[in-house]
């Protein structure tokens, strides 16, 4: 599931601008307990099927595994339509970063993630965009959730552990 930035209004007494786009029908937070989860281990090119229901576990796992092994999935092309738009200009985003640095230096916060929304119209299957993202940014924190009426996908760009030569670093 997920928690959006807008949830801060329910947990703290902080005034914020509504960052929800008018056509965004995603709730502020949503968590689901799934009976079955397919975990993709991208670096090893493996999948793991996790079952949380022990009563009919074996029969259902075999049915799901057969569907996965079928390899007869329809895929659709993905094409961008028109130009990319953003909620902020480059200068507005730079000013937000400058303000964030000031807050860090004053000790108001210890970390800030300065996000900027970009929008791009498209035709086709957004799962193909996720697959492309997975190939150009093979982050261990990739996610794709299809909730039916909306989908959320992305990856975390930061490095938490890196290896350079014979040295391992934790960031």
What do the PLM-derived regions correspond to, one by one?
Residues 2-171:
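Extended alpha-helical targeting/anchoring segments
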């Amino acid at each position: 599931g997920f928690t959006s930035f807008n949830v801060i209004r329910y947990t703290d007494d902080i005034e914020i601008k509504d960052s929800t786009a008018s056509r965004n029908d995603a709730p502020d937070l949503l968590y689901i307990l799934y009976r079955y989860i397919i975990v993709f281990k991208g670096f090893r090119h493996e999948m793991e099927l996790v079952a949380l229901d022990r009563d009919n576990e074996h029969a259902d796992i075999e049915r799901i595994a057969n569907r996965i092994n079928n390899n007869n999935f329809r895929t659709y092309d993905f094409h961008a339509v028109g130009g990319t738009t953003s909620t902020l200009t480059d200068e507005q985003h730079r000013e937000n970063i400058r303000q964030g640095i000031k807050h860090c230096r004053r000790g108001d916060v210890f970390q800030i993630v300065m996000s900027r929304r970009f929008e791009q119209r498209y035709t086709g299957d957004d799962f193909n965009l996720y697959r492309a993202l997975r190939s150009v940014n093979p982050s261990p924190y990739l996610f794709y959730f299809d909730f039916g009426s909306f989908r959320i996908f992305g990856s975390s760009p930061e490095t938490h552990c890196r290896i350079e030569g014979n040295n391992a670093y934790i960031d």
